[in-house]
Every structure is written in C-alpha cells, then in structure tokens.
C-alpha cells in the first residue's frame, strides 16, 4: 500500500450525505434510445465483414498478409 499525504479523500457511510443530493443520480442518467444501440450494432457488424475475394478463416487484423 502506498500512502500519499497530499491526497485527501472524504468517505461518507451514508448513501446520500445531503437531502438535496437525493435522487441526483437518477435524474442524471438518461435512457439510451434503441435506435442508437441498433446503429452501433450495425456499425460493428459491418466492420467485421470480410472483404470480397478474401479468405474467411483469416482474421481482419491479418487480412493484409497474402501468400506468394
């Protein structure tokens, strides 16, 4: 364990120290629309497709290596 005397952290045993803070985390989190999730899934799926004419068993990271 390393001790840094210049760092000071306050730890409270209560989940919310002040009444004003109550519910602050719930208000700050917004639900992500399903359209955004679907778009991300489509982009990652398109990125993992093998280009035409390449061998399917090679990984995309090594697809630039060609046998001579």
UniProtKB/Swiss-Prot annotation:
The keyword Phosphoprotein is assigned to this record: yes
Protein name: Neuronal regeneration-related protein
Localisation: Cytoplasm
Phenotype upon loss of function: Normal heat and mechanical sensitivity, as well as normal formalin-induced inflammatory pain. Reduced formalin-induced avoidance behavior, which reflects pain-related negative emotion, indicating a role in the affective, but not in the sensory component of the pain. Also exhibits altered behavioral responses in learning and memory.
Record-level GO BP terms: axon regeneration; regulation of neuron differentiation; regulation of transforming growth factor beta receptor signaling pathway
Post-translational modifications reported in the UniProt record: Phosphorylated on Ser-59. Phosphorylation decreases stability and activity.
Self-association state and partner proteins as the record states: Interacts with FLNA. Interacts with the latency-associated peptides (LAP) of TGFB1 and TGFB2; the interaction results in a decrease in TGFB autoinduction.
Biological function: May have roles in cellular differentiation. Ectopic expression induces differentiation of fibroblast into myofibroblast and myofibroblast ameboid migration. Increases retinoic-acid regulation of lipid-droplet biogenesis. May also have neural functions. Promotes axonal regeneration and augments motility of gliomas. Down-regulates the expression of TGFB1 and TGFB2 but not of TGFB3. May play a role in the regulation of alveolar generation.
One Pfam family here: Alveol-reg_P311
Keywords linked to the UniProt accession: Cytoplasm, Phosphoprotein
Biological source species: Mus musculus
Primary gene name: Nrep
Region (Disordered) location: 42-68
Presence of the UniProt keyword Cytoplasm in the record: yes
């Amino acid at each position: 364990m390393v001790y840094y005397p210049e760092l000071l952290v306050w730890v409270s045993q209560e989940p919310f120290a002040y009444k004003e803070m109550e519910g602050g985390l719930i208000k700050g989190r917004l639900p992500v629309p399903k359209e955004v999730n679907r778009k991300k899934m489509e982009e990652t799926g398109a990125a993992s497709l093998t280009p035409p004419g390449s061998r399917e068993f090679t990984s995309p990271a090594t697809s630039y290596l060609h046998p001579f």
